[in-house]
Structures are given as structure tokens and as C-alpha cells.
């Protein structure tokens, strides 16, 4: 059933029908389409735009269709143009002429953005739960590794000693920001567009606030042209999804490196690894690699919609039909990525000894040696130069700084005393960094407490429970 056609002398070409159809994509919004139609039909009856009898017939029919679709008694007809025409034609088939009244005071232009907002609000709720679960995994892993020394890197060169807990909590901060962006996207999705019509509202005395309340929106949109033209909320969501994938990808890249024989910092659980068809010894970090690869796919979804929208005049244009495929693909990809990544991190084993050995072999305590001299009265720039000379000699002699005798150290500066060895002990290097945000156990425990409170604040929230 087409929702148009009176002014045409002949039907559309079958190829055009296939090209124009969106039913393969938007059929996943059947619940939202029916929910929106239920609220609309109820409002039409309350406003006496249609009779109470007609309103009741329509809502009863819609509820029956929803029940049958949920139970797979009714399946979507893929020859329909879109989910809106399918629901309306199915309704008319079941209840007769009353079904033709459903579209009174409504256009597909405001109907489709209503469906999409209803769908996206639910999806954002689920997405935030998935991120919060990953945060819980990072929280528990961080508690286990407050004292696990590892090298921190800059330019992928060993820099200063930190702890695995400190490292994991860095990603927890990223995902906290991601949750903030999801919350923001939800707020801007939470405005009800129905009643905007094709572009200029309606001549009927509709009650948009009633529909908004019935559907759980906090407000209504205020300009009908903008309402049917707006896909900012989709683009904002895609941007947030892209950042989530960027964070997962960065973390995945590190996991991939840590799994190598050269690093051997972690071992992934068999359940989150794969093998080789030819090399029996292989254990591959495919989950992390796939997440890294799928990041480009989500970026592509964002660029797709930005490109679609960049040249569109007001109001609705058919180009906008491309929004849902990009959004649904990104949502599906990010959701699966978050869940598999959380499982991978939760089950991975940490090689604490290898992490500490790696930190010890990279002169990661050189800054602390310079700081030792400064605290004894040297200027930092002078101390920096002295320690640089010490490191150079250690490299030549294949030694670590702590292998040098006090006499050897005094050749570079008479300031060195016996207490220097405690100052450059890796645990001391970490524990002395008590500044908020640092790797000391005191600082990390504070970060853990903050993360716990961040997670706890969502208890009882619709987007958590």
C-alpha cells in the first residue's frame, strides 16, 4: 500500500520502488512507529478531530498488531515502501475504513523523526548501560593492580614508572566523558516533533503536549521547519559513538602490543582469542584487532550523514532517508564492541613481573634521579644534564642507574648520597607522585573512589536500571 498516488497517471517503475524503499532498514522501528501512532490516535479522539469510536478502534487495532508482530504472527511485508505504510495498511486490513483516519493531522515527515527519536532514546539508554558495565570492569581491575608497576610511555618510548591501575583509570576517564556525551545526545533527542506535519504544522486543533507526555518526551520542538529537517541529534550520537570507538581502538592497540612476545604484559583468555589455520602455536588478539578495524566503519557512518546533510535546504528531503542505515550500523557496531571488549578485559591475565621488569630496564627512574639532585639544591636544568650523562654512560656499559656505585655517581655530582638508591627505587618513584591524578597508591585510590561514586550516581536512573 502506497500512502500517495492520486495525482499520478501511472505507477512507479519497479526499479524505482526498490530504490525508494526503506523497509529493510526502518522495519526495526515497528514498535516505535506503533507507539507513536497510538499516542497520535488517542490525541485525535480527545481533541474530537476523529470520533472516540474511531480512536478506540484504531488504538485497539494497533495494540493487536504490536502483539502479533512481537510474537512473529505478523511479519513485515518487505514489498512495502517503509514501516509507516506497512503499519497503516496492516491496520486498515484488520479494522477496515477506520484505519484510513490514522494519518489525519500527520505527515511521514514528522512521523519518521518521531519514530527515530523514540528508537534512539531507547538505544542511548542501552548504550550507557554498556559503557557503565565496562567502567565497572575497569574499576575492579584497577583495584587489583594498585601496586602493579609498569612503564609509562611517551612517543612509545619508556618514560616514567606508573601502575597498571593508573593506566586503566586513564581509560575510565575517557569512558566517563563518553557517558557525558551520550547524556547530552539524549537531552537533544528528547524533544517531541509530531505535529510539525510536512513542514508547516496542521490546521487541526492538535495537542502536541499531550502526545509528548504520552510518549515520555520532556518537551516539544518549537519550529516545524526545523523539526522535520533536523538530524543533528543523529549526527551528535554518531559523533559520540565515533569517540567511543576511538577510545576502544586506542585501548585495543595497547592490548595487541601487550600480548606480543616482545611485551608479554598480558595474556588474553582463550574465549577472547583465536588461532591460525596453519600455525599451531598462534593465539591471536582478534577481538582487539576487529575493534580497531571497526572504528573506521563507525567514522564512515558519521561522515556519511554529515555529507548527506551538508547541502540540504529546508525542509525534508529524501536524502535524509540515509540517516537510519548509518545510525543503526554504528549503534550495532559500538554495542557489540563494548560488550566484547569488556569481556576481554575482565578475563585477561596480567604478567606483573614482566611489567615491572620492563619498567626497570628502561631508565624510567631518570626523572626521579634529576628530582633528587634538585631537592638537594641543584637547578633542574643542571640536574637534567647530569642525569643525561649518567644515562649515556649506563647505555655504553649496559648497566641500569641503580647498578652504579655511590662513588661512580659522585663522579657526576658530589651531591649524591646513600639515600639516592631509595629515591630511584621504582616503588618510591611511583609513591612519591601523590599529586591528584598521579600513579601513587594514595592518588589512585582517590581516583577509584571517584569512579565508584560516578558509577553509583546512576543507580535508580532510567538510563541505568
Swiss-Prot record:
SUPFAM superfamilies: L-aspartase-like (SSF48557)
Cytoplasm recorded as keyword: yes
Spans traversing the lipid bilayer: none
GO biological process: arginine biosynthetic process via ornithine; L-arginine biosynthetic process
Gene Ontology cellular component terms for the protein in this record: cytosol
Known pathway: Amino-acid biosynthesis; L-arginine biosynthesis; L-arginine from L-ornithine and carbamoyl phosphate: step 3/3
Gene3D superfamilies: Fumarase/aspartase (C-terminal domain) (1.10.40.30), Fumarase/aspartase (Central domain) (1.20.200.10), Fumarase/aspartase (N-terminal domain) (1.10.275.10)
Keyword Lyase: yes
Protein name in UniProt: Argininosuccinate lyase
Superkingdom classification of source: Bacteria
